[in-house]
UniProtKB/Swiss-Prot annotation:
Subunit text: Homodimer.
Localisation: Cytoplasm
Name the UniProt record assigns to this protein: Ribosomal RNA large subunit methyltransferase H
GO cellular component: cytoplasm
Segments forming a coiled coil: none
Catalytic reaction equation(s): pseudouridine(1915) in 23S rRNA + S-adenosyl-L-methionine = N(3)-methylpseudouridine(1915) in 23S rRNA + S-adenosyl-L-homocysteine + H(+)
Function per UniProt: Specifically methylates the pseudouridine at position 1915 (m3Psi1915) in 23S rRNA.
Record organism: Lacticaseibacillus paracasei (strain ATCC 334 / BCRC 17002 / CCUG 31169 / CIP 107868 / KCTC 3260 / NRRL B-441)
Keywords, comma-separated and alphabetical: Cytoplasm, Methyltransferase, rRNA processing, S-adenosyl-L-methionine, Transferase
Taxonomic lineage of the native organism: Bacteria, Bacillati, Bacillota, Bacilli, Lactobacillales
UniProt record similarity statement: Belongs to the RNA methyltransferase RlmH family.
Amino acid sequence: MNIKIIGVGKLKEKYFRDGIAEYLKRMDKFAKVKIVEVADEKAPENLSEAEMADVKAKEGDRILGKIKDKEWVIALAIEGKQRPSEVFAKEIADLGTYGHSDITFVIGGSLGLSPAVMKRANDTLSFGKLTMPHQLMRLVLMEQIYRAFMINIGSPYHK
């Protein structure tokens, strides 16, 4: 299985990079995991609705440029589908079983994802209504993907 995580902006904080590196190492035996960063658009405070849409559209174009036709795309969004870890694990396993071996997760920037990215997504995922920095969301997503693999092999990691 190939897993790609596309995120807007660079991870500058060492503690986030270290955490992600740890999960990349742990997942190495289950999947080839690749992190792809796309440039974020500079967004000053107090943007109009039109300016926000423009920022999301520009970031969205960069994201879409990193997605291949065959990839199964899961967009992370507050309004996405919430599910327990066990259900998420089964969905990941089922995707592989049904021939979707290239899974791409997309994490938007501070303003979220463009309508074009949401339209391209085959599914959505939400970790709840909480607002989190998109940098932290990368680490949380990595942990949940790792947890899914652990659930699927019956590991005691998930208790």
